Structures are given as C-alpha cells and as structure tokens.
C-alpha cells in the first residue's frame, strides 16, 4: 500500500508546498498536462501525490482517503467538526499566513470591539426588525467565536467570493473573512474590530486519524526521516 499525500493543485500554495518538501530532499512535481491534476514524488518510495483543491483536502483527510494533506488550518477547522479527533497537526509550514477577522463599516465610529458589535446588533434589530447580517464562508468558526464572546442578534449570510463588497452592495452589515494585509478591507471602507481575531491561519501538514496506516507506516517512516517528523502513536 502507498502513502497518499494531498497537496493544493495550483497557485502559490502548491508552489510553496513543493518548495518546502524540496528543501528537505523530497521532490514533488506535476506530471502530464497542467489541468490533469496528477503528480509524482521523487526521493521516497511508496508515496503517491494527490493534487486537490485546498478546500477538498480537509474532507479527504476526514474520510481517510489520504494519509497526509497540506492545507490551511482555517479550512480544517471550518470543514471538520471536532477536527482534532479526525486529523493531527504534524507541522506548521510557515507560509500561507492569513487572519480570519470580523470587520464593520469604517464609519461605525462607536463600534470597535465585540461588545460594541453586540450592542450595535441589538440596536439594529430593534430599528429594522431583523438581525444584523454578517457575510462569511466560515460559518462554523465565526458562529463558535461569536457565541463564546457573547454576541447575539446577528445572522450569518453565505458569501463564497468578494465578501468585502457585500457591505457596499447592501447584502450585509458586517463581514468575517480572511485577510493578509488588510488593504482590500480598507479599500472597501471596512475596519477590523480590535478583539475580533477569529483564527490566525497558515498552511499546515496534517495527518488523518481515519486513514489505514497499517501498510503506510513504512513509507511514512522514510518520509518522516527526511522531514524530521515522527509518526504520532495515535495513528499507528
């Protein structure tokens, strides 16, 4: 049996992942045409490269169809309930940094904290008859965060792209989204609440707790020796 490792199929995440493994003596490369999403691993026997979208990798790890996967820590926490029971964090990779934050219109001069947001949400509902809308694609993470911080009288509305524009377009009053520099937020006249860092994300190498490791432990031992990573006892 081979050890299957899922890697983002395109863009900077794929390039940075290839670089990270390559610096440790494990060469990953695409094979065939660019859109075939097939690849190979050189330097370690018995390792199969599976190219997937970053959003698919948590699901494949949770289902046990791949043994290892590189994806954002935000995506694993969002897509897998009780994520730590389904996967183990093997190594932070030091790239793909971004923060999941909550932002409101910059002209809300009296709203700077989560307590302020809670008060504004209550006032909004009293004035308009419906809950304040927060646009996001991170429903699980944002809901858990707001609940833990006592924010009520809001509703999450789904946004799978251009979330920063939802306030300007009138489909939401606030947003919860990933940002690296904050430039896009400022361009859309939004400000980050001072205490609303939901999650600080980066690319992480994860191991599946649901995969069959009985015959993959050998290839992982060879791979782990290159990477300086032991196989967690819970996975054997």
From Swiss-Prot:
It comes from the Bacteria. GO terms for biological process: L-histidine biosynthetic process. SUPFAM superfamilies: Periplasmic binding protein-like II. It is found in: Cytoplasm. Pathway: Amino-acid biosynthesis; L-histidine biosynthesis; L-histidine from 5-phospho-alpha-D-ribose 1-diphosphate: step 1/9. InterPro entries: ATP_PRibTrfase_cat, ATP_PRibTrfase_CS, ATP_PRibTrfase_HisG. It is an enzyme of class 2 (transferase). PROSITE patterns: ATP_P_PHORIBOSYLTR. The keyword ATP-binding applies. Its EC number is 2.4.2.17. Disulfide bonds: none annotated. Heteromultimer composed of HisG and HisZ subunits. Catalyzes the condensation of ATP and 5-phosphoribose 1-diphosphate to form N'-(5'-phosphoribosyl)-ATP (PR-ATP). Has a crucial role in the pathway because the rate of histidine biosynthesis seems to be controlled primarily by regulation of HisG enzymatic activity. Belongs to the ATP phosphoribosyltransferase family. Short subfamily. This is ATP phosphoribosyltransferase. It comes from Cereibacter sphaeroides (strain ATCC 17023 / DSM 158 / JCM 6121 / CCUG 31486 / LMG 2827 / NBRC 12203 / NCIMB 8253 / ATH 2.4.1.) (Rhodobacter sphaeroides).
